[in-house]
């Protein structure tokens, strides 16, 4: 039986980052990964477009710190914060959207800032974000918030407390300051992977965790003793491990959301409409239209039941 100081299950960005941080104090680390690649949900297809995670925010402090540590600042490409909104068969800009619903706010930033900083005496975990908005916002302003956000999950599924945290920290609805990395977000996971490999940290691909015991794990290849064990996996992986069966009720309180990207590549000579195309939030099943390059467009980016709809066609 092998002995390791640290075992990490999962070679996605969370597992790689865990190994990176722990390597400052020990390199006696082994990562096991069930698939044949690292990066998890961060995956850039042929260095052209991101199939998984698609953007990063400058409010994500750990991400920004990591980019600086790996000297990747020169690869940052800021995303144009200006969007169009396709509502009731009309293409509107920000001011057009506000005017369409007779909003009392001068900008979406002002509206979102008021909402996420509003002090309420309600227990926010007892309301969806949409229901919570109804407790203090006029219907016309809620419509603007719905149409400008575009996402179903954050508006209708999350409790208000989690939604506000997500909207402030991840969605940055006040500043809308996002970026991509030239060459794809996989550059970040590649940098982490190359670093830990340079420290002689072992990554076992195509290795499935079968069960966890008090001082060892069992994989489909071998049994390994550990001093410390870290799991960087998704809910589905947790509930498949016998060790966690007693905690099934707790895991069942967590739901996993759906996201789907549909890409299309166009001949620029025949599709002049692509020129200067802005990111567009729609009120139909396309949900989001996001230009990637001059000839590559994400013709639909959807979540929740709309993502399920496209997946079942």
Over which residues does each language-model region extend?
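A short alpha-helix-loop-beta-strand transition element characteristic
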Residues: 63-85, 121, 139-148, 271-278
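Short hydrophobic core segments
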Residues: 7-9, 32, 209, 217, ...
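N-terminal Rossmann-like FAD-binding beta1-loop-alpha1 element of flavoenzymes
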Residues: 4-31
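C-terminal segments that line or cap access tunnels to active or ligand-binding sites in enzymes
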Residues: 233-313
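Dinucleotide-binding Rossmann-like beta1-alpha1 core, especially the glycine-rich loop
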Residues: 48-114
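Conserved Rossmann-like nucleotide-cofactor binding loop
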Residues: 14, 37, 236
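Glycine-rich FAD pyrophosphate-binding loop
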Residues: 23-46
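Active-site/ligand-binding neighborhood in enzyme catalytic cores
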Residues: 116-207, 215, 232, 237-242
């Amino acid at each position: 039986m092998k002995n390791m100081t640290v075992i990490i299950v999962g070679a996605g960005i969370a597992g790689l980052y865990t190994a990176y941080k722990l390597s400052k104090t020990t390199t006696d680390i082994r990562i096991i990964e069930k698939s044949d690649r690292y990066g998890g949900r961060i995956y850039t297809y042929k260095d052209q477009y991101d199939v998984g995670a698609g953007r990063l925010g400058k409010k994500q402090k750990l991400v920004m710190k990591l980019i600086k540590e790996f000297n990747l600042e020169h690869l940052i490409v800021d995303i144009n914060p200006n969007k169009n909104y396709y509502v009731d068969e009309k293409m509107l800009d920000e001011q057009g959207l506000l005017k369409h619903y007779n909003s009392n706010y001068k900008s979406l930033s002002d509206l979102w800032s008021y909402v996420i900083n509003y002090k309420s005496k309600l227990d926010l975990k007892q309301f969806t974000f949409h229901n919570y908005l109804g407790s203090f916002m006029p219907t016309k302003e809620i419509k603007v918030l719905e149409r400008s956000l575009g996402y179903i999950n954050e508006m209708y599924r999350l409790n208000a407390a989690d939604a506000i945290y997500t909207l402030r920290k991840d969605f940055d609805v006040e500043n809308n300051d996002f970026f991509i990395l030239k060459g794809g977000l996989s550059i970040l996971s590649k940098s982490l992977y190359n670093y830990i490999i340079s420290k002689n940290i072992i990554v076992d691909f195509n290795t499935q965790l079968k069960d966890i015991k008090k001082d060892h794990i069992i994989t489909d290849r071998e049994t390994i003793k550990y001093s410390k064990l870290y799991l960087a996996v998704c809910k589905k992986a947790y509930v498949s491990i016998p060790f966690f069966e007693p905690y099934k009720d707790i895991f069942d309180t967590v739901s996993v959301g759906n996201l789907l990207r549909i890409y299309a590549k166009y001949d620029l000579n025949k599709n002049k409409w692509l020129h200067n195309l802005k990111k567009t939030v729609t009120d139909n099943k396309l949900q989001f239209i996001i230009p990637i390059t001059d000839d590559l467009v994400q013709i639909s980016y959807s979540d929740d039941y709309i993502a399920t709809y496209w997946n079942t066609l």
